[in-house]
């Protein structure tokens, strides 16, 4: 039962409820008019009778998210990078803007305002929750739609738990999510890949790039290889290497929160009071574990590299620190992913004739080339790239190089507009005349440029 009391110029609604521990609590809510107080009284009595009453809570967005995050990490056995990424999103993209707001006062328009604010926010405005001083150039680079979409996704998941936990009656996160960025990936042609590899003189960089181009590897997978992953005699002497581990540098805070079941090894810190750790972990999904077939050139390079590792150890065994990894420095310590990226950036600075791409772009370049030479055999390429599903592979590499589009257009024109000697649908083309089967035509149309599809529709209707 709820009661209305006039207190000065306002009206108060007093009611009693049981908290989450079953304890009886009194609550007062003030309203400027009697009408508002009456409406609230009716609402409270209805919810108490129906068992849908929401226990008043002053918990803030920041308090809730920092309580929710480790619980989800433990429940879903997140990898360190997953925890670190979500923590960064909360600390840098959510708490600075709505962290002090009470959960029960959040409305959908607060979420929309957050998305609008983030769309006008420069990248790196906050790091570990601390406001950063940006240069004028840095202020011109804004958060992407994909980043804002990730904020929406995280809040949608978190606030749904808030509903289940009885903190919110319903989630304030809008149904419509911010649109992801659709910027086309920059990749290299096969000629550029070959020329770039030939120009790389640094042995560590050369081998890393060679492995990436053959196997479409991720950076962490490259430096996560061990000599035991290599089998020169497998596949009737072709040779293979297995991808089943990944190397990452993660914050110690994340390492302390995650389930250590996926952690294979934690490398010793190089610096005292380091806030991060270098780890070797199992690959992120079952599909990421895969076997890659060597090329003869890669096979020879790997043999020479292993011989060099043995020679390095023999030079000074007492000072050699055998990390057990395939990629090692001359002193035996493991090569980190960041070193590969730095070496690649240095090489790019010295070779401006090549299109500028990030190191991960080599993986995209390799996967795209393999899709081309396989005739679009998605399942075969998926086995190499380690994508979880064929759809993910197709969606990731939906782009096609300009040369392929020109060739596709040429084949379409030759096949579609080919003249037949007889109007019969069973007519046999003259010798040397371009032909195209219905199956091939359908395959071409499925991958055709939108303009070509539009031309076909027009031709069919006229």
Give the residues covered by each predicted segment.
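Short, basic (Lys/Arg/His-rich) helix/loop patches that form interaction surfaces
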Residues: 123-127, 198, 202-203, 215, ...
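Short, polar N-cap/turn motifs at the start of nucleic acid-interacting alpha helices
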Residues: 229-237, 375-398
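Short, Arg/Lys-rich segments that mark the N-terminal edge of DNA/RNA- and chromatin-recognition modules
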Residues: 1-32, 240, 244-274
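N-terminal core-binding DNA-recognition domain of tyrosine site-specific recombinases/integrases
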Residues: 3, 17, 70-161, 182, ...
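Catalytic-site neighborhood detector that most strongly recognizes the C-terminal catalytic loop/helix
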Residues: 179-180, 187, 245-249, 385-411
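C-terminal secondary-structure termini that scaffold catalytic or DNA-interacting sites
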Residues: 232-235, 245-289, 298, 410-462
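N-terminal DNA-binding module of tyrosine recombinases/phage integrases
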Residues: 7-112, 128, 310-322, 402, ...
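Basic, Lys/Arg- and aromatic-enriched nucleic-acid-binding interface segment
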Residues: 127-145, 149-151, 164, 168-227, ...
């Amino acid at each position: 039962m709820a009661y209305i009391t006039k207190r000065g110029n306002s009206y108060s609604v007093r009611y009693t409820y049981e908290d989450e521990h079953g304890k009886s609590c009194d609550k007062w809510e003030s309203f400027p008019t009697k009408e508002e107080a009456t409406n609230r009284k009716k609402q409270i009595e209805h919810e108490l009778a129906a068992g849908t009453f929401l226990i008043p809570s002053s918990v803030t967005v920041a308090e809730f998210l920092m309580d929710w995050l480790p619980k989800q990490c433990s429940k879903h056995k997140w990898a360190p990078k997953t925890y670190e990424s979500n923590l960064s999103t909360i600390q840098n993209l959510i708490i600075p803007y709505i962290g002090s707001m009470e959960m029960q006062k959040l409305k959908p328009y607060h979420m929309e305002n957050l998305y609008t604010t983030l769309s006008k926010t420069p990248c790196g405005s906050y790091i570990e929750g601390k406001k950063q001083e940006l240069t004028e150039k840095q202020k011109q680079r804004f958060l992407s739609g994909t980043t804002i979409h990730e904020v929406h996704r995280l809040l949608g998941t978190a606030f749904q738990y808030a509903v289940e936990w009885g903190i919110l009656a319903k989630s304030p996160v809008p149904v419509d999510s911010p649109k992801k960025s659709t910027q086309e990936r920059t990749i290299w042609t096969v000629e550029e890949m070959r020329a770039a590899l030939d120009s790389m003189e640094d042995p560590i960089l050369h081998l890393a790039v060679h492995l990436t181009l053959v196997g479409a590897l991720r950076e962490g997978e490259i430096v996560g290889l061990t000599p035991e992953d290599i089998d020169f005699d497998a596949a009737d002497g072709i040779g293979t290497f297995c991808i089943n581990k990944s190397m990452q540098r993660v914050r110690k805070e994340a390492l302390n929160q995650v389930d250590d079941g996926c952690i294979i090894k934690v490398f010793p810190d190089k610096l005292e009071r380091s806030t991060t750790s270098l780890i070797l972990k199992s690959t992120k999904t079952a599909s990421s574990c895969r076997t890659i077939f060597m090329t003869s050139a890669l096979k020879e390079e790997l043999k020479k590299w292993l011989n060099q590792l043995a020679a390095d150890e023999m030079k000074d065994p007492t000072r050699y620190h055998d990390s057990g990894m395939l990629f090692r420095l001359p002193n035996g310590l493991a090569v980190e992913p960041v070193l590969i990226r730095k070496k690649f950036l240095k090489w790019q600075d010295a070779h401006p004739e090549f299109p500028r791409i990030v190191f991960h772009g080599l993986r995209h370049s390799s996967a795209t080339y393999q899709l081309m030479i396989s005739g679009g055999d998605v399942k075969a390429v998926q086995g190499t790239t380690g994508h979880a599903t064929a759809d993910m592979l197709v969606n990731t590499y939906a782009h096609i190089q300009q040369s392929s589009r020109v060739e596709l257009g040429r084949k379409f024109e030759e096949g579609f507009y080919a003249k037949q000697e007889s109007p019969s649908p069973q007519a046999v083309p003259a010798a040397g005349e371009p032909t195209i089967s219905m199956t091939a035509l359908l395959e071409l149309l499925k991958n055709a440029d939108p303009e070509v599809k539009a031309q076909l529709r027009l031709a069919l209707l006229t």
